[in-house]
């Protein structure tokens, strides 16, 4: 979409039509091409929720990761849990959930119950008192290629699953989706060009976006890089 403050897509299209009508021949064709390209590069489009079952329900988000991921960064789960819940909480008027468990409560539970990963999904949902449990199994989290301490090549991936505790099968996922994001977008970015905190923050924010966006309608840039 053309980057014109205060103008919606319909208004922009009408203005384009008026401009083209006032021109003729090659000029009109050239202008149409430029405008179409600008629209594609700077515009956005609506993306509908992949899972709509949060409406009218309470939810919790819990993240599991293997010892390698946790050993490399013991705070990763804390940051991701809070980041994802924060994005979902900020959009509660869109997805329509009627309540959620704060990240600090989930993390406190995980700390106090170190064997929680052996619990059934239904039991976890009951523990939090929610109708929907968003369970995220982190599968890969790295900031660079193994053995290369000089170039950034961040990857964060995981499987998102939703348990419907009030459904017929509270111990089985009613919905699943694989998520994978990368940062930086270009190769060859060195540790001197960007620091660890920047790479980490961008990678985790992209992952949190992709998880949260599964649950509500939203706008995405046409040329989004993740």
Model-derived features with residue positions:
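Bacterial N-terminal signal peptides that target proteins for export
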Residues: 1-14
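Bacterial N-terminal signal peptides
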Residues: 13-24
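Residue-level signal for secondary-structure boundary sites
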Residues: 69, 144, 166-168
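Short, glycine/charged-enriched secondary-structure capping and boundary segments
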Residues: 75-76, 149-152
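Beta-hairpin (beta-strand-turn-beta-strand) motif
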Residues: 138-141, 163-165
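Extracytoplasmic/secreted cell-surface and envelope-processing proteins
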Residues: 143-149
